[in-house]
UniProtKB/Swiss-Prot annotation:
One of its GO terms (biological process) is protein insertion into mitochondrial inner membrane. It comes from Yarrowia lipolytica (strain CLIB 122 / E 150). The chain crosses the membrane at residues 47-67, 130-150, 151-171. Pfam families: Tim17. Keywords: Disulfide bond, Membrane, Mitochondrion, Mitochondrion inner membrane, Protein transport, Translocation, Transmembrane, Transmembrane helix, Transport. The gene is TIM22. Belongs to the Tim17/Tim22/Tim23 family. This is Mitochondrial import inner membrane translocase subunit TIM22. Essential core component of the TIM22 complex, a complex that mediates the import and insertion of multi-pass transmembrane proteins into the mitochondrial inner membrane. In the TIM22 complex, it constitutes the voltage-activated and signal-gated channel. Forms a twin-pore translocase that uses the membrane potential as external driving force in 2 voltage-dependent steps. InterPro entries: TIM22 (IPR039175).
Amino acid sequence: MSAFGFPGGGAPTPPQGSFWDMTPEQQGMYSANLIMGTMQSCPGKSVMAGVTGFGLGGVFGLFMASMAYDAPVGMGVQTMSDLPFKQQMKIQFTDMGKRAWSSAKNFGFIGGVFSGTECCIESLRAKNDIWNGVAAGCLTGGGLAVKAGPQAALVGCAGFAAFSAAIDVYMRSDNKAPPSTDEDL
């Protein structure tokens, strides 16, 4: 793997002539190699994690906002039941949209930063082990909390590193594989 995950220093070159001079099979292989190279690069992984995190965060935020059946944040009314139904719906949907957007931005940012950091560390170390995720978790957690002070950065570093280590240990364990036959039980 080359520096920071760019495969072969850039996009693959067509085997002969232009793209349109290739056979359909060659075009398919060229396109597949281009897509795979992009998805395996650090920028590609970071963008994919950010977009996926954004989508997952939006769904999570929408779900959490729908579960908050009390008064929305910042509402000056004592109870929602005092308002007409149409006004209640308007306030609830506005609040759900704000929470979903906020959660989506946070999840997307954290996913993109963590994934990009982990990929860069893996490329620099030229190893694929648990310590890449631990270091990336520490850098991501500490970096996100650095504005709150050194203690918050240290707690963020430790928290993200521990969570990343726990997920990596679980994902690398052999316990998750189902038995191949009933006799293996």
